[in-house]
């Protein structure tokens, strides 16, 4: 019998509570660029990407349907330095996240090498739970 670990596939689904929990419990290494996904409450999430050395104009964020894509293309220096040690990675990247149906991007900021993308879940009223009033008399015996 074979066991397949699907947790790497689940890490980029945002807005699905079970998948968010799997993310928090996952200890697997992340791909470039490193990122965090925060859940502040049931309807607010934040994706933070660490992009040291990138400039705001090097970045592009697109939302197509439920697919959120972040692309980065750093400016290449005219004279490439001769590195003795290069620990900071400056390479082009494209990172995609699949959002839940009712997730919206509410904003993005780039400060001190960190790109923050804020997400909000807007549940339609037909999906939101409804409160039912409890009466003393039966509605059938009116």
Curated annotation (Swiss-Prot):
Q: CDD domains per the record? A: ACD_IbpA-B_like (cd06470)
A single Gene Ontology biological process assigned to it is: protein stabilization
Q: What is its main location?
A: cytoplasm
Q: Where is the sHSP domain?
A: 26-137
| Gene Ontology cellular component annotations, sorted alphabetically | cytoplasm
Q: Which UniProt keywords apply?
A: Chaperone, Cytoplasm, Stress response
Q: Where in the cell is it found?
A: Cytoplasm
Keyword Acetylation present in the record's keywords: the answer is: no
Query: Gene3D superfamilies, alphabetically?
Result: 2.60.40.790
UniProt xrefs under PROSITE patterns:
SHSP
Any notes on this protein's domains? The N- and C-terminal flexible termini are involved in oligomerization and in the binding of non-native substrate proteins, and are essential for chaperone activity.
Give the matching HAMAP family: HSP20_IbpB (MF_02001)
Family that this chain belongs to: Belongs to the small heat shock protein (HSP20) family.
Function text? Associates with aggregated proteins, together with IbpA, to stabilize and protect them from irreversible denaturation and extensive proteolysis during heat shock and oxidative stress. Aggregated proteins bound to the IbpAB complex are more efficiently refolded and reactivated by the ATP-dependent chaperone systems ClpB and DnaK/DnaJ/GrpE. Its activity is ATP-independent.
Q: How does it assemble?
A: Homodimer. Forms homomultimers of about 100-150 subunits at optimal growth temperatures. Conformation changes to oligomers at high temperatures or high ionic concentrations. The decrease in size of the multimers is accompanied by an increase in chaperone activity.
What is the name of the protein in this document?
Small heat shock protein IbpB
This protein's gene is called: ibpB
């Amino acid at each position: 019998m074979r066991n397949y670990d699907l947790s790497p596939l689940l890490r980029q689904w945002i807005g699905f509570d079970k998948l968010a929990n799997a993310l928090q419990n996952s200890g697997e290494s992340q791909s470039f660029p490193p990122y965090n996904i925060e859940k502040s409450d049931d309807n607010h999430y934040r994706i933070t990407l660490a992009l040291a050395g990138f400039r705001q104009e090097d970045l592009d964020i697109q939302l197509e349907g439920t697919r959120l894509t972040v692309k980065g293309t750093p400016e290449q220096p005219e004279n490439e330095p001769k590195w003795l040690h290069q620990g900071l990675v400056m390479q082009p990247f494209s990172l995609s996240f699949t959002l839940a149906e009712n997730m919206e991007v509410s904003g993005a900021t780039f400060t001190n090498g960190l790109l923050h993308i804020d997400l909000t879940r807007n549940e339609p009223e037909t999906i939101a739970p409804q409160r039912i009033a409890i009466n003393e008399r039966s509605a059938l015996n009116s």
